[in-house]
C-alpha cells in the first residue's frame, strides 16, 4: 500500500533539469491513448485490408487465368507445330535422296522456335505474377499507412480542445512559479 501512495505522491514531483529516470506514469506515457488508437486501427482497418486483399487476389487470379489462356494458345501452337513436323517428316521420307540434311535443319529450327516461344510465355507469366504481387503489397502498405495516419490525426483532433490547452498552460505556469519560489 505504501508503494501505491508513493507513486501518487511522485506524480506531483517533477525532476530538476539534467536528471532522467524511468517514467512509470501511465497517463504521461500515453499508453492508454496508443492502445485505443491501435485498437481502433485494428478494428476498422481489418475490413478494409481484407477488401483490398480480396480485390488484389481477384486481379492476380485473373492474371493467372490470362496467363493460362496464353499457355493454352502456346500449347495449341505446339500441337500445330507437331502436326507440321509430322508432315515434314513424311515429306522427308519422300525427299530423303534429295535433301535429308535440309529437312532435318528445318525440323530442328521449328522445334527450337516453338520451345523458345513457350519459354518466353512462361517467363512473361512469372514476371506478371511477381509484378502483381509486389504492386499488391505496396498498395496495401500505402493504404494501411494512410488509414493509420488519418485515424491518429482524427484522434488527436478530437482530444485537443481549448479547455485542455488552458488547463495545461495553467498547470505549467503554476509549476514554474513553484520552482521559482524554491530557487529564491
Swiss-Prot record:
Membrane topology: Single-pass membrane protein
Any one Gene Ontology cellular component term annotated for this protein: proton-transporting ATP synthase complex
Localization per Swiss-Prot or TrEMBL: Plastid, Chloroplast thylakoid membrane
Pfam families cross-referenced by the UniProt entry: ATP-synt_B
Any GO MF annotation of the entry: proton-transporting ATP synthase activity, rotational mechanism
Keyword vocabulary terms for this entry: ATP synthesis, CF(0), Chloroplast, Hydrogen ion transport, Ion transport, Membrane, Plastid, Thylakoid, Transmembrane, Transmembrane helix, Transport
Top-level taxon in the UniProt lineage: Eukaryota
Coiled-coil zones: none
Segments passing through the bilayer: 26-48
InterPro entries on file: ATP_synth_b/b'su_bac/chlpt
Keyword Calcium carried by entry: no
Family membership noted in the UniProt record: Belongs to the ATPase B chain family.
The protein's assembly and partners: F-type ATPases have 2 components, F(1) - the catalytic core - and F(0) - the membrane proton channel. F(1) has five subunits: alpha(3), beta(3), gamma(1), delta(1), epsilon(1). F(0) has four main subunits: a(1), b(1), b'(1) and c(10-14). The alpha and beta chains form an alternating ring which encloses part of the gamma chain. F(1) is attached to F(0) by a central stalk formed by the gamma and epsilon chains, while a peripheral stalk is formed by the delta, b and b' chains.
Note: In plastids the F-type ATPase is also known as CF(1)CF(0).
Function: F(1)F(0) ATP synthase produces ATP from ADP in the presence of a proton or sodium gradient. F-type ATPases consist of two structural domains, F(1) containing the extramembraneous catalytic core and F(0) containing the membrane proton channel, linked together by a central stalk and a peripheral stalk. During catalysis, ATP synthesis in the catalytic domain of F(1) is coupled via a rotary mechanism of the central stalk subunits to proton translocation.
Protein name: ATP synthase subunit b, chloroplastic
Organism from which the protein derives: Acorus calamus
Phylogenetic lineage: Eukaryota, Viridiplantae, Streptophyta, Embryophyta, Tracheophyta
GN (gene name): atpF
Amino acid at each position: 500500500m505504501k508503494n501505491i501512495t508513493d507513486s501518487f505522491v511522485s506524480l506531483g514531483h517533477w525532476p530538476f533539469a539534467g536528471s532522467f529516470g524511468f517514467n512509470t506514469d501511465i497517463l504521461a506515457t500515453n499508453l492508454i491513448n496508443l492502445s485505443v488508437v491501435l485498437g481502433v486501427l485494428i478494428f476498422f482497418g481489418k475490413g478494409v485490408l481484407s477488401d483490398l486483399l480480396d480485390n488484389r487476389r481477384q486481379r492476380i487470379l485473373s492474371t493467372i487465368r490470362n496467363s493460362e489462356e496464353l499457355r493454352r494458345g502456346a500449347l495449341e501452337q505446339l500441337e500445330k507445330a507437331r502436326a507440321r513436323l509430322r508432315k515434314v517428316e513424311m515429306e522427308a521420307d519422300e525427299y530423303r535422296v534429295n535433301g535429308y540434311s535440309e529437312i532435318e535443319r528445318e525440323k530442328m529450327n521449328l522445334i527450337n522456335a516453338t520451345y523458345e516461344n513457350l519459354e518466353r510465355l512462361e517467363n512473361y507469366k512469372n514476371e506478371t505474377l511477381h509484378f502483381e504481387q509486389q504492386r499488391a503489397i505496396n498498395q496495401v502498405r500505402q493504404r494501411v499507412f494512410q488509414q493509420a495516419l488519418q485515424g491518429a490525426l482524427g484522434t488527436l483532433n478530437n482530444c485537443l480542445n481549448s479547455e485542455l490547452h488552458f488547463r495545461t498552460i495553467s498547470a505549467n505556469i503554476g509549476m514554474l512559479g513553484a520552482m521559482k519560489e524554491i530557487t529564491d
